[in-house]
Structures are given as structure tokens and as C-alpha cells.
Curated annotation (Swiss-Prot):
Membership in a protein family: Belongs to the terpene synthase family. Tpsd subfamily.
BP GO terms, sorted: diterpenoid biosynthetic process
Any Pfam family matching the protein: Terpene_synth
Main EC class the enzyme belongs to: lyase
Gene Ontology CC entries for this record: chloroplast
Binding site for Mg(2+) 1: D379, D383
Organism: Abies grandis (Grand fir)
Residues bound to Mg(2+) 2: D379, D383
Annotated protein name in UniProt: Pinene synthase, chloroplastic
Gene name per UniProt: ag3
Amino acid sequence: MALVSTAPLASKSCLHKSLISSTHELKALSRTIPALGMSRRGKSITPSISMSSTTVVTDDGVRRRMGDFHSNLWDDDVIQSLPTAYEEKSYLERAEKLIGEVKNMFNSMSLEDGELMSPLNDLIQRLWIVDSLERLGIHRHFKDEIKSALDYVYSYWGENGIGCGRESVVTDLNSTALGLRTLRLHGYPVSSDVFKAFKGQNGQFSCSENIQTDEEIRGVLNLFRASLIAFPGEKIMDEAEIFSTKYLKEALQKIPVSSLSREIGDVLEYGWHTYLPRLEARNYIQVFGQDTENTKSYVKSKKLLELAKLEFNIFQSLQKRELESLVRWWKESGFPEMTFCRHRHVEYYTLASCIAFEPQHSGFRLGFAKTCHLITVLDDMYDTFGTVDELELFTATMKRWDPSSIDCLPEYMKGVYIAVYDTVNEMAREAEEAQGRDTLTYAREAWEAYIDSYMQEARWIATGYLPSFDEYYENGKVSCGHRISALQPILTMDIPFPDHILKEVDFPSKLNDLACAILRLRGDTRCYKADRARGEEASSISCYMKDNPGVSEEDALDHINAMISDVIKGLNWELLKPDINVPISAKKHAFDIARAFHYGYKYRDGYSVANVETKSLVTRTLLESVPL
């Protein structure tokens, strides 16, 4: 079966003809560029001045720029210290037993003490258990049970939402908000118009003047959570977000410190698009079930909580083995000797683990970490360290896709080329096993487009050219790297990607375009000042200001942030829109990669400055076990 493709590959006999027309000329050009840096198995050539400077003179006399980046934070001792005690048979058997007991909860969902469950709370009970399983990170064991529960809830869904139970006379904010959020995330067509029933005569959302009960607070909390799953044009969801944000912030000032207050704080802090599932599970484990007063609910909560803790800790044993494999690849590829670039392979692996922690998705996690590390190395090479002539040569050699052609490259580029070549080919073999077809041609096309976009930006930097916003934006959606970070990793998964599905997930799909857009725009808002200090003037902010003379930097940032808000809603729609041909499960991991990158840019450039929030993420989700 042919793969979707949008551009022909450069053939071996036609190597970037605008630059070089033959291997002889390729080698001739290479002689004008001094060898420097490091070969894959050679020695590094260290800059003659400190990494803290943005400009260095290397031993060959070439003046180069370097980023002021801190070193790798995670040595072998840290990796070896990862806990593995929970892979013992007794823990695995206990987890299996609990999975069976939770399934029994679903099977007896219609009964309470042998009687039919009250028609006044059967809907909220189903929503509660589904929501709890998802937030605790253990829902993968209960796919059939979750579908049955949500089918039941949806069968009672009305134009005003639902009450707590199937025979409730009055619709309930908590049930309706949680219902809309949960049903929408599972692809059920539910309208946000249900929230009109919770507005006052003045057209505004309203609650009691003085915050009264935990039940009321939880209803508004779920309204806030639902508002973040907004689609384009849903004005009422914007209103719900504004109202609920204000309400919850005021509630935090009035209620005592409790599991509910901590839950509110976490949800306000991370929202949805930057609340990575494993981080949410880690946080929710700490607050889940503590406010439960009902004895039966307490027993249910206790079982869910124990299973969540076991699953969290058991996964860490697998993480250790995968990290050992990743670090081995990093060392064997010669990366420790590459002094010009950032080393964030452990951080990228952590992001992958936070969005895909099913045991069978090892290929995705390792593939994502390796690809993102390569992206970072290339980013630092194209943006700062390499000269334009060297980069033109590297770009042409990449398109040749022939390791015998690397003799013409500077020494430091040889290691980079071989690492890309070997890793892309390795992932293509894994993808062929998973998909039953060759995907290398498709991967190469994606990498060519990516390298070309980097080369364009390198020319802009070298010439001081500031493009228009549209020119920058279109190129930047490619150079951000989202497409190549997602493409090969998702193809290694146990999810079929025939052509009609792949074209809705990868380029030129709207989902891919919006995911790339959010990474480019959010990245620019966090990086543009540091980039500008290194001589990289082009950003969405500066290009927008160029196109709109007189606009201040603050106004430009406001405009970009408004664009991001619109992009997020569009991305929600592309993921969750009703589509019988492309299931949500096929799009979810590409979507979650956008969430992972968005998290890294939540406070700052978390990939350059990885010793604050990003370090905390590694510690909380990778290094620390949850006490049982």
C-alpha cells in the first residue's frame, strides 16, 4: 500500500542541484570548510572559551555562536537509582486482583446492596468512576466497561444536560459539566448549549453569593474542566471558563486547606492542555478519596487508589530498562562529545512517558526521545554553531541519504549525520514490523522538509533578513519539529495507520497543522528574547511587529496569545469531531505530543532551561515512587 507523500525525494543522482551537481563538486565544496568539532568515534575539538559566552572561536579559527545552555542533568548514577522493587510477582498479582475487583464494580453498577441503584444518582456514579479511572491513569484496563457506562449516561442526555440520576427532575451542574467533558472526550456529540440552563436572567453564570458547600464548588470545578474542551465558536465555553476561574480562585481564599483545595490548585495551574496524564495521575493520587464520607464510596475509592499506586510504581521498573537503552544509544552515537548542543534525552523520554505509559508502547517512548534529541542537536547546529556554507553542505548530504557521502562533511557534522541516519532507519524497521509496510520513504520526505526549513532560517540569521509574519509562520510550523517528532514514533505503535487515517494525522492534515502551529507560537512567546540575544531576530512576535508598524511588543504578544487560544480550540475539534473513519485513538498520541511540548513551554523554554519545572517533572514521574 502506497504511503501518502507530498513531495518527491531528492535522488542520489540529483543532490540539491541548486547547490551541488556532483559528488566531485560536493567534495570540492567540503575542502573550503575546515574540519572541526567531533567525529562519531573521534575526539572533540573544544571551544577555546567558556560555554557561557554566545560567541566562541574554535581551535580552527572559525568564529561561532553557541547557546548558554546548562549541561545534562542526569548521569548514570541517577538512572541506576530508579526503583525496581515493584516488578516483584506479589505486586503484579495484587494489581491483577484489583483490576478484577474494579471490573466487578462496573458489573454491579446498577445495584446497591442488592437493590437497584437509585435512579437519582446512577448517572453521576458512572461518571465518577470513569473520571476517577482516567485521572488516576488506570483506565486502559477498563475500555469495554467505560464504553458501557458512557453509553448508559449518553442515553439519558438531554438538551439541558442531565441530573444526578436517570429520574432526576432538575438538571445538575456537576453532573452536566462532568458529563459533557467526559462524553466529549470519548467522541459523543454533546452540545455546550446545555450550559445555558445554568445562567441567570441576566445571561450570566451564577452561584450563591457566599461559597457554601463542597458540592457547589465541585460543580464549578467540573464546569472549568469542561470549558477547556471548547470547540471553535463556542462563546458559552469562554464565558464558563471566565466565570469558573474567578469563582475557584475566590474559593481558594475562603475554604480551608484540604484535598479539594489542592485539587482545585492543580487544575487551575495546569488546565488540560498542559496537564500531562502521568503528572495528573501523580498529583491526583495524593488527593483522591480523602473527602469521601460514605462508607461504600470509601471502599471503592480505596481499591482504585491502591491500584493506581501499584500501576504507577510498577511502570517505573520498565522506565529504568528503557532509560538504560536510551542512554546507551546516546553514548554510542557520540553525543557526550558534542559540546555545542543541549542534551535533553532524559527529559524527552519523561515527556513521552507522561503521555503514553502503556507498557506495550516502548517503541513510541524511545522513538520520541531519540527523535526529539536529534531535533535539539540539529536546532543548535543550524541556529548557532554551524556556518551557512557548512549547513548548505549538510542539508545536501542529508537529502542524498547515503553514509558514504559524509567524507565531505566537517568532522562535527559526521556524527550528527550518522546519528540521524541510523536512528531514522532503525525506527523505520520498527514501524514496518508494526504497520506491515515500508515507511522509510515517507519518513525521509518529512525529514527533508524539516531540514529545508532549518536551512531557510539559517539563511535569515546569516543575512539579517526579517521575513513577513506569514512567511515566518509557514516555515516555522515545519521547523518546530512536531511532525517528525510524532510521525515515526506513532507508526511503531499497535495502532493501524492505513493511508486514509495517516493523512488525517500527519501532514497535510489540519490536526498536524494546528499542532505545529501551537508549538511554533507558544515556543516563540517563551524563547524570542533569548533567541534575539543570540542574534536570531525572526520570531512570530518580531515578524508581526514588522508587518504592523507601531504595534508594541506587548500588543504583539497579546495577538499571538489570542492566536494560540484559537488554535487550541481548533485542535480540540480536530481530535474530537465525529468521524467514523478516523477514531480518536488514532489521533490521540499526535495530539498529546502537542500537549507535551506545550507543557515544556508553560513557564519558560523548558528545553533550554530544564533545571526548574522540567526537572521537577522528571523527579515526580520518573524517579520518585508513590508510597503505598
